[in-house]
Amino acid sequence: MSDQTVIERIRQHDVLNVGVSLGFKGLSFRNVLHNCWEGFDIDLARAVAVAVLGDVGKIHYMPLQSGDRFRALRDGVIDLGSFNSSITFQREAESDVSFVHPMLFDGEVLMTPASNLLEPVEQALYTRERRIAAMRGSTTEENLKRYFGHLNLSCEIRLFDSPTQARQAYQQGECNIYCLDSYLLAGERAQLQDKEAHIILQDRISLEAMSPAVSSHDTQWLKAVTWIMRTLIEAENLQVTSKNILEMSQEATGYLHTFLYPSEQHCKNLGLRPDFIRAIIHQVGNYGEIFQRNLGKYSELNQPRRDNNLWSQGGMLYSPLFI
């Protein structure tokens, strides 16, 4: 195994290799019209590219099936996994990967045709049939077994390797329920021609914390990506945006100045550019900007932030201090 650090390898090749999902609207989705990748997970990766290479464009995206994601990290095929993965005990214990910081709190929900409901009550308890499409290699199968066992309802879970396969099985009637994290499922529903005929039920199967992932073997890289993610959250907490960053960096005093102008030695220790915080905010934006343009009110999905508000606004997002 090479003694080269991940950051040294990235800089040598002048590109960040990022593993992404096979395509979820709002999270990581290839825009064929503009020939580019878009989404919440993509913007998190862009922030890392800015911090290390100074350029949001120096990324090579590698779409991966759920079952291949952590192997690609372990083997060094990718430098960063930004594929909407849930933090779990088993994954960190078995896969030689580390999750950096919770960046999206979400939970699995269910979508079904309105015709599959016994009564006009939007709950799983009132579904006629339960052939459920879910993703292979995710946490969904175990969560579904536990949830429907609790309801004392039988169900048949069918696993698929890609969202396209799962969505097609659902559309063709092979499955009559589709289970995904709520933000992902909103994106899948948006792609249905008759989306108004499909209902996302009130049931919430789980609450999970999603995070980018890195190999456990390089502590510098783990720390670097962790603090890059925290930069996005703390920038929103301090109300620094891509629109006001130039003005605020000129006028900054006290803690805001400490945040925007971190010690050069500290940046060097983490392998980051000395201006990485200001560059990230300028080129990518803060957490709120990223959420709203990909998942929230400025996106086609128009989803509420729910738990993904700052702690000061009743949400679960928090960053340790930059001191």
Task: Name the predicted role of every residue range.
Residues 1, 7, 50-52, 114-118, ...:
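Extended ligand-binding regions for polar small-molecule ligands
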